[in-house]
Amino acid sequence: MTFGETRTRVATRHALIAPDGHVPSVLPGISGAVANVIISPAMGANVTQLLIAFEEDGHAEFPAGDLETCVYIMEGGCVAGIDDASEPLEKGGFVFAPAGKRLELSRPARGTKVTVFQKYFDELEDVPGPAPVFGNEKNVEGQPFLGDPDARLKVLLPDTPSFDMAVNLFTYQPGARLPFVETHIMEHGLIMLEGEGVYRLEDSWYPVTAGDAIWMAPYCPQWFVAMGKGPASYLYYKDINRGPME
């Protein structure tokens, strides 16, 4: 019995979603899996973030349409297919399916868990749309964030005008932190992958640990410090490469 206690907090411009409050949803196209809608437009977000835990016979299909989709393999592995192309993905793997492309996840290993980010594609005039992407974070070199070698950022998707979505992996050594409180137009959806720390969101300070998810609306002041005896890392989404009036 929890006696009504939870670390989850849903505010107007930010949210911390702790795993103790997850309630699965039945979603079209997803079978043999437990799916949780972590972030969605129902809370005011412009991005949807799903957490899907597959059984061995699980399957997920995201139909072609106006939504673009990025999937990150947190545990296990599966086969990802975009139209006629497919690749096996293991832990740390990711796949990006542009709007207009069908994405399928099949043949998951036991214990496979994925995070999914989806948003409506914001087309840019005279700029071609993005191409599909398959990869693994192991093959992406982490760069010191603003010169700090203890805070390393991996940019998983191409940072070109074709893409209006970024998905990045941020890893901090114990004691490393963001160098200032960020306040910007980009929206974030985030999930802690390992370790622990403290996240400042607006005027609230939250202890966070692996499995916690965070939504940050545009201009939500935000700051993070890694604490504990091991590294802390999180995966996050942000919208990029579009003007404020588009």
Name what the model sees in each region.
Residues M1-A45, A109-D164:
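A short, N-terminal "cap"/entry segment at the start of jelly-roll beta-barrel domains
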Residues A18-P19, S31-I38, T48-G65, V155, ...:
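Conserved short histidine dyad/triad with adjacent acidic residue
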Residues V37, F134-Y206:
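Surface-exposed interaction/gating patches
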Residues E56, G65-D83, I185-E202:
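Glycine- and acidic-residue-biased ligand/ion/polar-headgroup-sensing regions
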Residues D66, S86, A99-L124, P218-P244:
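Ligand-binding loop in jelly-roll beta-barrel domains
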Residues V79-G81, L105-S106, Q173-G175, E194-L201, ...:
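Long compositionally biased, domain-poor regions of proteins
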Residues D84-A99, D203-P218:
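Short acidic-glycine-tyrosine-enriched beta hairpin
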